[in-house]
Every structure is written in C-alpha cells, then in structure tokens.
C-alpha cells in the first residue's frame, strides 16, 4: 500500500457528515459501536452527529441531532444499553415521517447514515434510501430546500450494524449484544443451579427469542441442559413422553437437578406455543418433581457489555465508517457483519430477505429449511446439542476403541467443558474413554482411570482443570508412556492445553521413530489464556481471561476518573503473546498497549507520555496503559511506571497493577464453554474416524503426518492441521505463532485513543454476497 493511499484515510471524510443512530431494542455493545463511529469519523476528517432516540429523533430533528466530539464518547465502552437512546417509531413508517427526516438531514448536510439496530430498523433504513431522490424532489417542490442543497445531498449512503441480543439476523455469526445476553443468562443459570441441587429441583428457564432460538440453544450447550425448546426445531409429537423419560434417566444416574431451557417463541410441530407453565405442569403431573419456572425477561438486555461485544462493536464501527466514506451512488446499502473472526460487508436487503425467509419457512412449517437458513454456526450448535442431550451410549462395548483425554500446560477456563464433551461423545460412539491426571507426567506414572457418563457431570461451568495439568513434556518419559499406552490399550489421545500441548504433540511425532507404541492418532485442542498455540486464531480460555482483565480495567478507570489526573499501568499475562493486552486495550479503551509483537523504543514511551499530558488538558483526566508481561526485558512494568511518574510530575500521577494469576481463574464465559464443547465433540469425531483408518491386523498403527493434528479455528472454519506442518509457522524461542491475525486490530486501538497514525485499509472488509443454505446441503 502506498503512502498516498495511507494518507487518504485521514482525509477521506473531509467535507462529509455522518449521522449515527441506535434503533429498536437496545443491546449491550451499541455504545462501543457509537464510540468507534464517532472517533473514526472524526479521525478521517468528517463531522459526526448523534441522532438521539433513534428514528424518532431523525423525524423530530432540532436538539435530537447534535454534533459529537471526541470527548463526548468517553467512558461509554463499559455501559450497557445505548447512551444516545432508542425508541420504536411509528412516524418513520409513514412517508410523511420520512420526508421530515430527509429534511432534517439535508439541512445539516448529512448524506451518510449509520444505523445500529435489528432487522426492522435496517429494513426501514433501506426503504429510506430507495425513496431518497423522490423525497428530495418533494421537498424542492414544497420550497423547503434549495436546488443547491438538493444537489449537495443527491444520494444517501447507508450502512447497518446489527445490534440485537437474539442473534436473529442472517448473514452474521454474532450480532452486537448476543454474547453479553449469554453472560447474563449463564450468570443466572449458575446461580439457580446451586439452589436447585440443594433441593433436587427441576428448573424451567425461559429466555428471550420470539422467532430465534439462538440464546436458548447456546445456553443449553453452555450449561449442559437436559432439554431445549426452540422455534426452529419443534420437538416430535410424543415429546412429552420423551422429555419425562429423559429427566428420570438423568435422576437415576445420580443427578440432583434437571435444567430445561425454553425460548419464548417455542412451538410444537403444529405451530402451537409451548409455554414454560405447560412444561412445569407436565413434569409435576407425570414425575412429581419439585419444579420451578424462572422467566428472565429484560435482565438479558442489561448489564455491562462483555469484552467480545465491545471488540465486536468497535471493529464493526470502524468498518461502517470506511464503508460509508467509500460509498458511491451505485453501492448498495450494506451491513457490516462477522464471519468467523473476519469482518465482511453484505448487501443489506439480501440479509433482510434471508431473515424473512426463515420466518416464512417456520410459518409454512418447513422447519428443516428454517434451520438451514440460520447458517452453519447455528446448525453446528444444534447437531452437538442433539448428540449430547438425546443420544444414549450403547450398552455393549464390543468392537470399541480406547481413547485417553488429558490436560497439559497451565489451567484455562473451559478445559473441563472440553473434557466433558470429549468423554461423552466418545461414550456415545461406543468407545472406552480414559482420563489422565496431571498431563504427560500422569501418563508416565499411570495416573489413569476410566470415565463413565456421570464422571464429567456438571463440568461445563467449572473453571480451572479438574483433571490436573502440568507443563511437563513427554520426551524424557517415552519409555514409561509407551508402557502405559500398552498396559491401558490406549489407541488415541486427545490433548487439551496450551503451547506445551502443541510441543508435546511434536515430541510424540518424533518419538514414533523409536517407539511403535506412540504410533497412535492424537489431536491437540488449544486451551490457554495466552492464545499462543500455532494453528488456531482462538484458544479455549482466552475469552474468560479477557473478560477478567476488562472487569478489572473498568474498576481501575472508575477509580482514576474519581481521583482525576491519574494514569494506571496494568500488566497482563500472555508470555510473549500480546493477544490479551491488545484485545483488553480495545475492550477497555486503553491509551496504549505495549506488546512484544510490535517492538517499541524509548521514543515511543516518551510519545505516549506526551500524549497523556495533552489528554489531561481535556475533560478526560485519566489514563490507562496495558503492558504484556514479556513485551520487553528492559522496559519493565516498574521502569514504565517510574518513567511515567517522573515525566508526569505536576501533571498526572501514576499507579501500577500486576493482575497475575487471577487471569487463569474464574468460571468460564459462555463463549469458552460453547467453543470448548464444540471443539471436544469435533476432536472426538475425528479421532473415531482416524482410529478406524489406522486399524490394521488387529492393532492401531498411525505414522502418517495427518494422524497428529491441532484442531484450530482458522478465519471462518474449524480445521485439523498436522502438527509437523505447523512447525515452520512457529517461533519456538518466544512460544508464539509467526503470524497473528489480531495484530491487524492494533491500529484501531491507537486511532480510538487519538493517535495520528496511518490506517491500512487493504485488510478492510469487501462486499460479498450472502451464501444461502438450502435443504440437502451439508453444514460445514
């Protein structure tokens, strides 16, 4: 990219005006998006306006449309809801209302509109855009606007960001607010679980989702529910019988509680609603269990946005500004959305159409079609739920294989969820599943036992590692490990852990030359707070650590805001990998994040101090600086603290916090529970296939490179990659992958902190078309 192109982003918005509004139901993370739109808009030289109270503010004009400043979006990131207000607006549905809205925009020279809301809000925006030229000619005829004003505002650019806790919009994997809503639900499920266990109760939990069962489905995966009712997949006609049998089976196996999750729009095959009360009455009447209903309601919309939603909102906000300013009269109104971890632009009306098609398919009782249209991610969730909740392990173990599961490295939240789904999917497939305590050390010492179905009951929501985990590598103990593989007849190995799990995998590959016993398939599931395992964009546990850091940063910022003129320097974990520091910097609104992956000098430190000196002259008199623990051996946390203290004398004072091992603890977030559960299921499916493939002459012999893999999330898919092939992509000295996708997000962090830098637009989203899944097509 040339310097001219770089420079173009800083002048892209000169002479242009952008209005941002939030409409429809509020969602956590909307404020992060508003903040990003305002700051990136100002960065490009554009004027940015808040439209208060959604479309109603657009119609009413006056003080509802105000110009935004850099400081006016400060301290917004950690707030739930929408600071600029939202309202359901009848006026905008009428042409007269849209005419007044057009007049208000033209008078202010605004030709770019960023709408953050659900499908109704975005459809309204598209209607507005398609009528724009007719509305202008009506205003001209009425003499309300001049010919010059009409020419200047000849076309309207519209970009939508989907803010909806239901995740009911087709074309995007996650809508802004969904992850935070899941946080609220899971907090409540965890709290209710303890009281239900004490009294041996059945809990019926109703969550939001009139036409979309995403929240209910992911909640059931994240808490190991016994049953879920969602509108897209109504239960079979004899569901009452099946449900009661399932609940009593769970109790017989020693469980003290049952959890049933119901989406508010749940229906049966004939379209008749299934209510929480119906389910409660059924369980009480047929089984006599003490059953309680909890309807969550608007709690789900409330509270602090999760780290995921803050980062999603910020990334989408940046993309929205770029899409608006690059727009021409010929570009269609688009939605900025997320696919895997990639930002994409999709034509707004294509997405709205597919979203309507889902509702239509459900109305016509074509439920398979509705499920396909929901997309790949939804279908994967449904398949894993069905396996874990509805398929029973076979009674006979004849012809079964033996698979061992272990944790390696440091503890990470979500490890237990991965172990649970690996064990249970293994049992469902008719295998014997062994669990190994204390990693490779335990494998060498024979700390191995067989796991049954209830062995891993209730593990999904528990943090840390219940099996015990060690950083020990296998090389020194190959003889003992080989002996135990033979003794316990282990035919496959699932290794859940961090960089040591990956390195251990490489050592096992090498050891195959000497020890035939090591020629068994193995798969590594990345699980570490550092997110530094080659072959995967995400690791189990990183999201939980990120949320822990965010919560702490919010509290520290609050303290600094009260004290005034104070800068906090916070040290995060991650070894040499700067993922936690960078992402927490984005999510908590840090002024700087020092990491090993982006070398810095004393001049950079001085520039940051000078930047904070300037910041103290504004209304925002506080600073937050993050430092990755191994970003530089000489510029330590103490050094940076001392430098800031000296240079800031008389202007600001400094404090330091080393967060330490609290980042490894805590209950796993919904993202980590769900991600770990799906990874475990996928790993075990692969393992069963590989064992069958490698079975020759009555024994397993696997010595091909593809029989030892890392299962990783790469851009938009879960893929198995041979560990040997990942060797070249690894910096072993610093225990990090050579290429890390999140480094591309660092310029956004700097721009949002008001640094004058170049923004490389080469990696921005381009317009794509929505891929539609029809009946009969396989989910990837």
Curated annotation (Swiss-Prot):
Q: What is this protein called?
A: ATP-dependent 6-phosphofructokinase, muscle type
Instruction: Kindly list the positions annotated as binding Mg(2+).
Output: 119
Q: Which organism is it from?
A: Pongo abelii (Sumatran orangutan)
Extract the NCBIfam families matched here. Answer: 6PF1K_euk
- Give disulfide pairs as residue numbers: none
Q: Which family does it belong to?
A: Belongs to the phosphofructokinase type A (PFKA) family. ATP-dependent PFK group I subfamily. Eukaryotic two domain clade 'E' sub-subfamily.
Q: What would be one Gene Ontology cellular-component term for the protein?
A: membrane
Q: What is the stated purpose of this protein?
A: Catalyzes the phosphorylation of D-fructose 6-phosphate to fructose 1,6-bisphosphate by ATP, the first committing step of glycolysis.
């Amino acid at each position: 990219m040339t310097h001219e192109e770089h420079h173009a982003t800083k002048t892209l918005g000169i002479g242009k005006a952008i209005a941002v509004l939030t409409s429809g139901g509020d969602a956590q993370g909307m404020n992060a998006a508003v903040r990003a739109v305002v700051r990136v808009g100002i960065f490009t030289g554009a004027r940015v306006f808040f439209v208060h109270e959604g479309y109603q503010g657009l119609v009413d004009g006056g003080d509802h449309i105000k110009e935004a400043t850099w400081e006016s979006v400060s301290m917004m990131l950690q707030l739930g809801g929408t600071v600029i207000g939202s309202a359901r607006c009848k006026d905008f549905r009428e042409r007269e209302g849209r005419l007044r809205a057009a007049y208000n925009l033209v008078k202010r020279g605004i030709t770019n509109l960023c709408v953050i809301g659900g499908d109704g809000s975005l459809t309204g925006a598209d209607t507005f855009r398609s009528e724009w030229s007719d509305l202008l000619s009506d205003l001209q005829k009425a003499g309300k606007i001049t010919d010059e004003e009409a020419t200047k505002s000849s076309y309207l650019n519209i970009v939508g960001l989907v803010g909806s806790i239901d995740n009911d919009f087709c074309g995007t994997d996650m809508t802004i607010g969904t992850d935070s809503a899941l946080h609220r639900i899971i907090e409540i499920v965890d709290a209710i679980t303890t009281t239900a266990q004490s009294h041996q109760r059945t809990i019926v939990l109703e969550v939001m989702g009139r036409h979309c069962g995403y929240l209910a489905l992911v909640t059931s995966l994240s808490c190991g529910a016994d049953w879920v009712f969602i509108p897209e997949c109504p239960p079979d006609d004899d569901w009452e019988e099946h449900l009661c049998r399932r609940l009593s089976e769970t109790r017989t196996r020693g469980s003290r509680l049952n959890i049933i999750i119901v989406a508010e729009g749940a229906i049966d095959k004939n379209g008749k609603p299934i209510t929480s009360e119906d389910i409660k009455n059924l369980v009480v009447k047929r089984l006599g269990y003490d059953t309680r209903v909890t309807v969550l309601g608007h709690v789900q919309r409330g509270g602090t946005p999760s780290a995921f939603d803050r980062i999603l909102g910020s990334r989408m906000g940046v993309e929205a500004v770029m899409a608006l300013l690059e727009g021409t009269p010929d570009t269609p109104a688009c939605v900025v959305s997320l696919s895997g971890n990639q930002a994409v632009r999709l034509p707004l009306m294509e997405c709205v159409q597919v979203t309507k098609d889902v509702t239509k398919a459900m109305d016509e009782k074509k439920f398979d079609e509705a499920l396909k249209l929901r997309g790949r991610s939804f279908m994967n969730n449904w398949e894993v739920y069905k396996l874990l909740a509805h398929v029973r392990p076979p009674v006979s173990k004849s012809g079964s294989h033996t698979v061992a599961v272990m944790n390696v490295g440091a503890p990470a939240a979500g490890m237990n969820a991965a172990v649970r789904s690996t064990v249970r999917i293994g049992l469902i497939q008719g295998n014997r599943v062994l669990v190994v305590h204390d990693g490779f050390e335990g494998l060498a010492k024979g700390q191995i036992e067989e796991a049954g179905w209830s062995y891993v009951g209730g593990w999904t929501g528990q943090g840390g590692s219940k099996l015990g985990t060690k950083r020990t590598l296998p090389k020194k103990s190959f003889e003992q490990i080989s002996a135990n593989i033979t003794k316990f007849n282990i035919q496959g190995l699932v290794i859940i852990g961090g960089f040591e799990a990956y390195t251990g995998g490489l050592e096992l590959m090498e050891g195959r030359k000497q020890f035939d016993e090591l020629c068994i398939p193995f798969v590594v599931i990345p699980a570490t707070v550092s997110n530094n395992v080659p072959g995967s964009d995400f690791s189990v546990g990183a999201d939980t650590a990120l949320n822990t850091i965010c919560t702490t940063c919010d509290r520290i910022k609050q303290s600094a805001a009260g004290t005034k003129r104070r800068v906090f320097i916070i040290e995060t974990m991650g070894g040499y990998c700067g993922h936690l520091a960078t992402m927490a910097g984005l999510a908590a609104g840090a002024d700087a994040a020092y990491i090993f992956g982006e070398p810095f000098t004393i001049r950079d430190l001085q520039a940051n101090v000078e930047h904070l000196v300037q910041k103290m002259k504004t209304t925002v008199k506080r600073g937050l600086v993050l430092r990755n623990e191994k970003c530089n051996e000489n510029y330590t946390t103490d050094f940076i603290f001392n430098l800031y203290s000296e240079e800031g004398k008389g202007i600001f004072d400094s404090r330091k916090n080393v967060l330490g091992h609290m980042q490894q603890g805590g209950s796993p977030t919904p993202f980590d529970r769900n991600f770990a559960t799906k990874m475990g299921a996928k790993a075990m499916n692969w393992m069963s296939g590989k064992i069958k493939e490698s079975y020759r002459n009555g024994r397993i012999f696997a010595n091909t490179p593809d029989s030892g893999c890392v299962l990783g999330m790469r851009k938009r898919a879960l893929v198995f990659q041979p560990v040997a092939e990942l060797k070249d992509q690894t910096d072993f000295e610093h225990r990090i992958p050579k290429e890390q996708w999140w480094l591309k997000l660092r310029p956004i962090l700097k721009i949002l902190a008001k640094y004058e830098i170049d923004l490389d637009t080469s990696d921005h989203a381009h317009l794509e078309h929505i891929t539609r899944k029809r009946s009969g097509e396989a989910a990837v």
